[in-house]
């Protein structure tokens, strides 16, 4: 899962949206650095990552990547799941329009920014203003996201080419998303994530 899905599942679980978004920027034990609700959100994010990576639908989807891009498939798929969530938001969350949810999420996250790591502050400088969570619905933007990650982290250069795997298996990936994401939503609503 990427930013939008983590925020969405956190909302459904009544967990800290701030902690769920912050988690990728925190190493080790967060308990000494953040309040308990944010720590709980960080731990939820980490559980979701492990759960998602081990779902049969996700493991199957990783096999569709070519040998040269399979190593980055988990990262690529995380971004792709956000694409489908953004694209189908009105079906998955009809009572909370995406733009309203984004405003709500941003307000939640802004409360922890003063005490956050610089990389997280930097992310927030463009995540909201450039409307990433809405733009995830466009495949051209997904390609830009993957290229951006590859340029910032040279060892992940294969992300550039992984876009072709997404494009080649788009319909099958969308089917897998519909198989697992509603289940995860139900788990979040029952606080079982």
From Swiss-Prot:
It catalyses: holo-[ACP] + H2O = apo-[ACP] + (R)-4'-phosphopantetheine + H(+). GO terms for biological process: fatty acid biosynthetic process. InterPro entries: ACP_PD, ACP_phosphodiesterase_gpbac. Its EC number is 3.1.4.14. It comes from the Bacteria. It is an enzyme of class 3 (hydrolase). Keywords: Fatty acid biosynthesis, Fatty acid metabolism, Hydrolase, Lipid biosynthesis, Lipid metabolism. One of its GO terms (molecular function) is [acyl-carrier-protein] phosphodiesterase activity. Converts holo-ACP to apo-ACP by hydrolytic cleavage of the phosphopantetheine prosthetic group from ACP. HAMAP family: AcpH. Belongs to the AcpH family. This is Acyl carrier protein phosphodiesterase. It comes from Shigella boydii serotype 18 (strain CDC 3083-94 / BS512). The lineage of its organism: Bacteria, Pseudomonadati, Pseudomonadota, Gammaproteobacteria, Enterobacterales.
């Amino acid at each position: 899962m990427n930013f939008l899905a983590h925020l969405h599942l956190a909302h459904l679980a009544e967990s800290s949206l701030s902690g769920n978004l912050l988690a990728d920027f925190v190493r080790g034990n967060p308990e000494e650095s953040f309040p308990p609700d944010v720590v709980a959100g960080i731990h939820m994010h980490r559980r979701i990552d492990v759960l998602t990576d081990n779902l049969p639908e996700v493991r199957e989807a990783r096999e569709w990547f070519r040998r040269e891009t399979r190593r980055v498939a988990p990262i690529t798929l995380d971004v792709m799941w956000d694409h489908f969530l953004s694209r189908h938001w009105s079906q998955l969350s009809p009572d909370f329009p995406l733009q309203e949810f984004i405003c709500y999420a941003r307000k939640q996250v802004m409360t922890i920014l003063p005490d956050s790591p610089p990389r997280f502050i930097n992310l927030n400088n463009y995540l909201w203003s450039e409307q990433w969570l809405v733009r995830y619905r466009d495949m051209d933007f997904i390609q830009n996201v993957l290229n951006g990650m590859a340029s910032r982290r040279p060892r992940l250069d294969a992300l550039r080419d992984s876009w072709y795997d997404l494009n080649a298996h788009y319909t099958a990936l969308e089917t897998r998303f519909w198989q697992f994401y509603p289940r995860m939503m139900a788990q979040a609503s029952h606080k079982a994530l």
